[in-house]
Amino acid sequence: MKQKNCHFKKIIGIDPGKSGGICVIEDNKRMMAYKCPADVHEMCTLFDNIIKGTDISYLSVYIEKVWARPSDGRVSVFTFAQNYGHWEAIVASKGIEPEYVIPSTWMKHFNVPSGLKKQDRKNHIKGLANNIISYCYDYDDYYKGNKYQFRGKVTLATADAIMIARYGIDKTT
């Protein structure tokens, strides 16, 4: 089912890498972010908890569209592709058609300087995500007890997902 271009109750941003994360912004007020769970069963459980009680017409999912680079090792490429496929399957199994966004698109939207070394870029994005949550969102114990629970601290694992979800908010409002 194609998502409608209107205000959504929940915007979900997914950084699909094994060291990535998932972020949900509810009603543009409350935000939760989680590192990527260790296996597909935990990924399913987390996604189910995030969307529980929400009609899919009120969900919008943004997945970062990324690909392997020639310099990536075979094992890391396989692990990444497997994780990427897991997220796609989990989202599709709920009848949701995600929006795909390439990194340069959402980074340009937030004026992330091009040409930064990878670690510098990651730290810059983490700083942007910290600014966003500090000024815009409440985070609480809504999913208390979940071992992947967001505790108000942006990490390198959750920063991209937070920015992707915020990009989704900007594109749907």
Predicted features and spans:
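Phosphate- and other anionic-substrate recognition elements at nucleic-acid/protein interfaces
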Residues: 1-173
